[in-house]
Amino acid sequence: MLQSISHVALVVNDPARTAALFEDLFDARRVQRQDDEGHLETFVRLGGVWIALVGAPVQRARTGDHIAFQATPDIIEATVAKLERMGREFIRARSNRALYFFDYDDHVFELNTEDIPAD
């Protein structure tokens, strides 16, 4: 039986810059290490999930694909204020119960206040 998500890997142009975005927005924990083949790996921890930031050239079209984190209304409002100060694009949705924002490589992240029903 599966236990939990180990990590989510995202290909990004600049792992350090993307990690800094999450550090600035959420005080995310950043870990860098070398793998067995000597490649530098960058991870950030968001909402209990490790995000692996894989450095490679990337151009993404915006689709409906996204990673969503549950958050309180206060966290959403604080994130909006930070995104505005940073000049980052974001979209409010569902009567302000959800917030979508984009990293530097157009990956979409959602913060929402709604629970997914158990059944």
Each language-model region and where it sits:
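Short, conserved charged micro-motifs
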Residues: 17, 74-79
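Vicinal oxygen chelate
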Residues: 31, 80-81, 85-119
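Short aromatic/hydrophobic contact patches that present stacked aromatics
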Residues: 7-9, 43, 50, 66-68, ...
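Core segments of cupin and vicinal oxygen chelate
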Residues: 2, 9-51
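N-terminal beta-strand motif that seeds the catalytic metal site of vicinal oxygen chelate
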Residues: 1-17, 64-67, 71, 117-119
